[in-house]
Amino acid sequence: IVNNDTEDRLLTGADFDPESFVQAADGTFWVGEEFGPYILHVDKDGTLLDAPYAYPDVKSPSNPTLGAEEEPNLRNSKGFEAMATDGRYLYPIFEGYLDEATDKRVRVISQFDTETGKYTGKTWDYLAEDDDALIGDAFLTKDGRLLMLERDDFRGSEAQLKKVFEVKDFADAKAGSTLQKDLMANLLNIANPGKIGMVSDARAYGVGDPFQFALLSVETIIQLEDGRYLTALDNNFPGDDGRYRGKPDDTEMITFSVK
């Protein structure tokens, strides 16, 4: 973008595809994106503070530095959809598998040091439910659990995978290891004894007991201060219609508890 008030061309969505956001203690933001994939560091106004941090030896077809004779090794839109943090360190996670992966369920988790601005070289392997499962988001809880949101690319009655898993020992997990995960919540089978939405949205898909978050791009999982969890939808407006067929999905957010 260039206009009479700009000295240089402004960065836009044609340059980067921001997907995951982490706010640092100083109020700045770290952003995971998918074109590079890169990690970006911006201030509270969105001004880029450092040159984009490239991931070593991985490039998507949309990477601007990809040479004419160079082969990409990560599919488009399979970069850093998810990124967790424990404060100093970021944990960007590939949404899909790397092209050279022998087991295409593996989703690589890496560690990035915000103080040095470098990847530490530590990685962990997380096994998704199947080759095509997508990592929608990740979150590190205060007690050291890594929450991983897995989803498929379907909506409504066709949706089969919208689940939150937890890695209970991530804080102590050895680098280079394959992580052990446990199911925390099936978002297609949420108990709804309070009948939330059953009167106001009686014709909507998945509104009942159990409640189903059977929407396409479920891409948020966080734990709230009171212990509940929040998940949310990227509605890809106006393309998705998981709740009412033929009607663009709203941006839905729901909170739930785990007993």
Where does each model-flagged region fall?
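Sequence/structural signature of beta-propeller domains
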Residues: 1-259
